[in-house]
A protein has these predicted regions:
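Short beta->alpha connector loops at strand-helix junctions that form conserved
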Residues: 105-106
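Conserved N-terminal beta1-alpha1 strand-loop-helix module at the mouth
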Residues: 2-96, 101
Length: 107
């Protein structure tokens, strides 16, 4: 499984803006192809996760993130927009799936 360099966070560019590409607009049928296309330009892959409760859409899930991790060494940032009841279990599941950074949308 490809993984980013252990010091990926410390090695982010300091002389330009960081390019964090959202996978929301990727073609789900060709997700691996889209991840490969943007790899030379993306510092981080951004994956929004919505549960249909906290946020109205259903977006991405741990198994899909695990598949992305299998084809990409680009760091993966998970943005959780989910209900409190499942927050801790989702953090664990996305960490196990290969997330390198997890942020929580709080209100």
């Amino acid at each position: 499984m490809p993984k980013p360099h252990p010091d990926w966070f410390l090695n982010l560019p300091k002389d330009r803006l960081i390019a964090e590409f959202s996978m929301w607009s990727a073609d789900l049928v060709r997700l691996a192809d889209d991840a490969e296309k943007i790899a030379p330009y993306a510092d981080i892959l951004h994956i929004d996760v919505a549960d249909g409760h906290f946020a109205p859409a259903l977006l991405f899930f741990p198994d899909l993130v695990a598949r992305i991790r299998q084809v990409s060494a680009t760091p993966i940032h998970i943005h959780l927009m989910i209900a409190d009841e499942v927050l801790l279990s989702q953090i664990d599941q996305f960490a196990e799936a290969g997330a390198d950074l997890i942020s929580i949308h709080c209100e």
